[in-house]
Structure formats: structure tokens, C-alpha cells
């Protein structure tokens, strides 16, 4: 009998995506949606990057744990990720926080989100589990990381990257030896330790963990019985493994998917208004830092059935144009000028208006003679005629959310409050 080719490692693995976080540093952008459901790049949601990485890596079994403001996220997954077929041994389960039998609590922490769904993970009949954060933007081949995990015999393998020490307070920070074995792990330290020989930077966790499922399963059960645990991977489980087991680091640069267009590995947290705006605006550069045009590593998402973008009017001072910008389907640029901006699906910009370095989420309307610079417009915002943003910092801060970096977040609630105050 002809020998069968060996299974890919990812065929024996599942991705467990933690997608329940609010992302409070994004302020009003997450008032109505969880951070993983926040829009990114013209048509995608942030969670699409983790799911696409898993899909492109060969993983066909996924579970998504949701909690905060989950409706828009669940609807997006149902619409855009509904092609998994049980007949092909493919699964994508959405696991909302719920009070299960004999329990009266929601997810208590990142580890507890997995613990409460042990029976579901068991049903997948997998050998490895890859724990993923659903709120980061990057392209990564998880199979390379999984292969390292198997070759080293680690209890856990943690994805890591180098970040400036000043930014490392938001991450788990680790020390490693010459063989990438983790010797110390601190979750979100107030004073992050630097890398020996490179004290300006720290080695930060990406929130990506690879485990043998049998090992993690036992660890989760013991953690659930510990009254002193916060039931969190970064605070409880990972430090315990570093101390008592074998924890290995995996450098993101070893598995980052790059096309040659990017000059360095790309990973963004987009956890603040400034970071969110910058990462979107970066896509308008002549040579973007993140290549979304890679047909070998597509970012899968829900695609609405909409007509192409349209540009109308061609008279002096009333010409529908977009320069160094991304304009999505169903947008109509009518006699207005768009520069270095990103328009999501279904936006309308009217005559004599101008936009520069603006991120407009779906179904935004910009009325006549508006002049907008350096701002983020939330979904469905209707910008009134003649509104000016980005020229007077004091006036911007009076009505809207102005970030430390000078980026202005505009929501419909803010515009309505402004209209009531001025009338």
C-alpha cells in the first residue's frame, strides 16, 4: 500500500482566539464594539488578521471567545467566516461568555476563557493549541512557530518581538538565554527591564502561546482550583511555567510573512487613537509598511456586495479626486478632494469639502465645505456643512476627543452634543 504523506503540524492544531477585550484606550471607538471588531484597512476588522494567519498557516479548527459588546463581532464572523465545513473536518466556533452549568460567572481572565470551554476543545481531537490575541495587526506563519515548539520540547512557546522600553509597560516582558529559553517573565511591568546589551528596548510578548493540549488542559484545571489565581495567562500560567517548566521564546522575525515590499517585520497593537490612525494612514504611503496586496497571504474578511467607488464633477474647485488614498467600494467622492486618507465602504463626500489624513469608517457622510485634517470619523458619522477640524486644537478638544498626538476622534454623539450646544 502506498505510504500516506505526513500530516502538516497545523492539521493537528487549533487556534483559540481571545476576542473579549474592550480596548478602553481606543475610547469611544469601542463604546459599541469590542476591540477585535474595530475596522481596519478599508474593509477588514482587526480580528481578521489573527484568523487569516491561522487560515493561511493551514489551521482549519478555530474557536473565538467573546465577551464585551460581542454582537458586531459575532455578526462579522457569521458573515465573513462561514465557509468552514464539518465534512472536511473544519470547525469555527464562537464561544460567548456564558454562565454554564453549576457556574454563576463570566470569563474571569484569559486562561479562564479556555478553561470554561475545555469540553469543546476536547471535541476537536487536536494535539496542539495556539492561543491568539484577536486584537493585533500582523502577518505570521504559525506553522513555523509550532515547528519550533515541537523541536524544542517546550511546555509553552511564546511569540515575542522587540519594542521600545517606554512602550513595554503594556506587554508581558521576558528575559531569554542564548537558546531562547525564557528565564524571567513579567506581565505589564511598571519599569520594564531592557534587553542585555540593548537597554533601550525590551523583549515583549505578542500574546501568542503554543501548548501541547494535554499539558495545557491539566494546567488549566489546576489553575481553576487555585483561589489565589486571577486565571490569566500572562499573570499566572506563564510565570509558573517559566519557574517550574520549560518556556521558550519564538522571535516574530522568524515567522513574519513579508513580500519584499515591507522593509521590516510589521506588528501593531493599534490600541490607542494615535496608533490606530497611524497604522491606517500608513497604508496610503507609496510603499506601505504592511503589504495588503499579497495574494499568497490574503487577509480574509466579509465582503459586501456593493458597486465600485465613484468620482464625479470636474470643474474648478469642484473636482472629485483622491490622491495617495484608499477608497473602498460604494464610496462616492462628489466634487471633493481626498488626500492621504482612507475611506471605508459606503462613504459619501460632497462638493467643496476636503479631507487630509482622515480615516473614515463605513457609511460616513461629509457634507459641503467641510475641511477635515488628522482625524478619525466613526461609523455612520454625518459631518455637518462647513465643519473645520484639525486647524484649531482648542476648538477640536472642546467638542471632540483630541489625542495626545493631536488626532481628533469624531462620533455622532459628539456631533449631536455640539449641535445642541450651538442651537
UniProtKB/Swiss-Prot annotation:
The keyword Nucleotidyltransferase applies. Keywords: ATP-binding, Carbohydrate metabolism, Glycogen biosynthesis, Glycogen metabolism, Nucleotide-binding, Nucleotidyltransferase, Transferase. Pathway: Glycan biosynthesis; glycogen biosynthesis. Its EC number is 2.7.7.27. The keyword Metal-binding does not apply. It comes from the Bacteria. PROSITE patterns: ADP_GLC_PYROPHOSPH_1, ADP_GLC_PYROPHOSPH_2. One of its GO terms (biological process) is glycogen biosynthetic process. Homotetramer. This is Glucose-1-phosphate adenylyltransferase.
Amino acid at each position: 500500500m502506498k505510504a500516506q504523506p505526513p500530516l502538516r503540524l497545523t492539521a493537528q492544531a487549533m487556534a483559540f482566539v481571545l476576542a473579549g477585550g474592550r480596548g478602553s484606550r481606543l475610547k469611544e471607538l469601542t463604546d459599541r464594539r469590542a476591540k477585535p471588531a474595530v475596522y481596519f484597512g478599508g474593509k477588514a476588522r482587526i480580528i481578521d488578521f489573527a484568523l487569516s494567519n491561522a487560515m493561511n498557516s493551514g489551521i482549519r479548527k478555530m474557536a473565538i471567545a467573546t465577551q464585551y459588546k460581542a454582537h458586531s463581532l459575532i455578526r462579522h464572523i457569521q458573515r465573513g467566516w462561514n465557509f468552514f465545513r464539518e465534512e472536511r473536518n473544519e470547525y469555527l466556533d464562537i464561544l460567548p461568555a456564558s454562565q454554564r452549568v453549576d457556574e454563576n460567572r463570566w470569563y474571569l481572565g484569559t486562561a479562564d476563557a479556555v478553561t470554561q470551554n475545555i469540553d469543546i476543545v476536547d471535541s476537536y481531537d487536536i494535539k496542539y493549541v495556539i492561543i491568539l490575541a484577536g486584537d493585533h495587526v500582523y502577518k505570521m506563519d504559525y506553522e513555523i512557530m509550532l515547528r519550533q515548539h515541537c523541536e524544542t520540547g517546550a511546555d509553552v512557546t511564546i511569540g515575542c518581538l522587540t519594542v521600545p522600553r517606554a512602550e513595554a509597560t503594556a506587554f508581558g516582558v521576558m528575559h531569554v538565554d542564548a537558546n531562547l529559553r525564557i528565564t524571567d517573565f513579567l506581565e505589564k511591568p511598571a519599569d520594564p527591564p531592557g534587553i542585555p546589551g540593548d537597554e533601550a528596548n525590551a523583549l515583549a510578548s505578542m500574546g501568542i502561546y503554543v501548548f501541547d493540549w494535554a499539558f495545557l488542559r491539566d494546567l488549566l484545571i489546576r489553575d481553576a482550583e487555585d483561589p489565589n489565581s486571577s486565571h490569566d495567562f500572562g499573570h499566572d500560567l506563564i510565570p509558573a511555567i517559566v519557574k517550574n517548566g520549560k518556556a521558550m521564546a519564538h522571535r516574530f522575525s522568524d515567522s513574519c510573512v513579508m513580500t519584499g515590499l515591507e522593509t521590516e517585520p510589521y506588528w501593531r497593537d493599534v490600541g490607542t487613537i494615535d496608533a490606530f490612525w497611524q497604522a491606517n494612514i500608513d497604508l496610503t504611503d507609496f510603499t506601505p509598511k504592511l503589504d495588503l496586496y499579497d495574494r499568497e497571504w490574503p487577509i480574509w474578511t466579509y465582503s459586501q456586495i456593493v458597486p465600485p467607488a465613484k468620482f464625479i464633477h470636474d470643474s474648478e474647485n469642484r473636482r472629485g479626486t483622491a490622491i495617495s488614498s484608499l477608497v473602498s467600494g460604494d464610496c462616492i467622492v462628489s466634487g471633493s478632494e481626498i488626500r492621504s486618507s482612507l475611506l471605508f465602504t459606503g462613504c459619501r463626500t460632497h462638493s467643496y469639502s476636503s479631507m487630509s489624513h482622515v480615516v473614515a469608517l463605513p457609511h460616513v457622510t461629509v457634507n459641503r465645505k467641510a475641511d477635515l485634517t488628522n482625524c478619525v470619523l466613526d461609523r455612520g458619522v454625518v459631518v455637518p456643512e462647513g465643519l473645520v477640524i484639525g486647524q484649531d486644537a482648542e476648538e477640536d478638544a472642546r467638542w471632540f476627543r483630541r489625542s495626545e498626538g493631536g488626532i481628533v476622534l469624531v462620533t455622532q454623539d459628539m456631533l449631536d452634543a455640539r449641535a445642541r450646544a450651538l442651537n
